[in-house]
Amino acid sequence: MSARAPKELRLALPPCLLNRTFASPNASGSGNTGARGPGAVGSGTCITQVGQQLFQSFSSTLVLIVLVTLIFCLIVLSLSTFHIHKRRMKKRKMQRAQEEYERDHCSGSRGGGGLPRPGRQAPTHAKETRLERQPRDSPFCAPSNASSLSSSSPGLPCQGPCAPPPPPPASSPQGAHAASSCLDTAGEGLLQTVVLS
């Protein structure tokens, strides 16, 4: 039996237990009685040795467990802080973007309200250009009182400086004078054309 004992059991058990298990009970009589005293003392020391070995192994496993838990807690803490920081950064970015958008929108609305709209100025400008072009675009003299001239020679241009268009009917003498000057110039033009022909 002693030769068949596994080596692992020999390494695990303390030497006192190995000595007691593998010792042969050959002593008898007085020898046995004399050996009981030191056996009792040896059993006490053996218990203390076993307790020390168990405490050492338990303490080593406990230290390993504590180290593993600490490492795991550190990893979890670092991941949680990273996620929290990331969420805060996202919230700050969203707030900044919203503030910039609100500022741009407010500035655009204020600028658009203060400046006049270009669509409203276009009709007045067109009216002014039309009023300016009306006296310039009349190269033909068309007095209201020159009916004979229109029947005899329609569409003849005025040679020389032509008088401006007649004023309203309130100023009748000035209109008559303008019509007479236009008639004189038209008559001179007719005479020149007849002589040349």
From Swiss-Prot:
Which portions of the chain have biased composition (kind: Basic and acidic residues)? 96-107, 125-136
* Topological domain ranges for the Extracellular compartment: 24-61
What is its subcellular localisation? Membrane
Q: What is its main location?
A: membrane
Biased amino acid composition, Low complexity: 141-161
Query: Quick check: keyword Transmembrane helix in the entry?
Result: yes
Q: Where is this region: Disordered?
A: 94-180
| Compositional bias (Pro residues) | 162-171
Q: Where are the transmembrane segments?
A: 62-82
- Topological domains (Cytoplasmic): residue ranges? 83-197
One GO cellular component term? membrane
InterPro entries, from UniProt?
Answer: C11orf87 (IPR037670)
Topology class, membrane:
Single-pass type I membrane protein
Q: Which residues are glycosylated?
A: N26
The secretion signal range is: 1-23
Keyword terms:
Glycoprotein, Membrane, Signal, Transmembrane, Transmembrane helix
What is the name of this protein? Uncharacterized protein C11orf87
Organism encoding this protein = Homo sapiens (Human)
The primary gene name is C11orf87
